[in-house]
Amino acid sequence: MSEAADVLVVGAGLAGLAAARDLTAAGRSVVVLEARDRVGGRIVNEAIGDGKIAEMGGQWAGPTQDRLYALAENLGVATFPTYDTGRKVLHFNGRRGTYTGAIPRINPLVLADVGRAQARLEALARKVPADAPWTAARATQLDGQTFQTWVRRNTASSSARKLLALGIEAVFAAEPGDVSLLHVLFYSHSGGSFQQLIDTTGGAQQDRFAGGSAVLAERLAARFGDAVRVCDTFVGVPQLCRL
């Protein structure tokens, strides 16, 4: 089948669908191809019976994510506060404990160690331009070391390193040795601070979306009708002429 369109968008996640929206608003014809049998990319609503769903991907929003909130409002998707009441559970160093508030009850010396490292991290993050992190002073050096390497050099205890690792794993879904220091600094600055990234109320996990986050992609895709093709794998683009 042959069909003409000004722009072919590959992937029907939020980025692809938002690109299609903006291109359409600019007067361009668009076709969106998605290899999966659904739209949404890394946001997924999984049915678990009785009309209920579990969110299997990205599901939170918080301060600094103004465009996401604006998109939800435009699509008529309400938000609600993430449940953050009661006692919290921490399994650390082979022990399980509960606590209230923002700070767990562990060795004060360990908390001080974490606090010093986090203060240094926040100071470094403020020096990395959120809109162009590669232009930061010593960007190559910062990108050439993992967050794990930096933590080892800036903490005195293994317990402090484990706590900081928990924060990285929660935010990035990756191990400290799998992300560069520059990326952590950029991400922290973009999100307000490293502390804000891991917080609930006032932080990146502050709100959730009624009906599940995948509703955002589903409603946005519905605006394009048949121009969004699921189960349609992109193979390649032939070069027909030299520019």
Predicted regions and their residues:
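FAD-dinucleotide binding site
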Residues: M1-L243
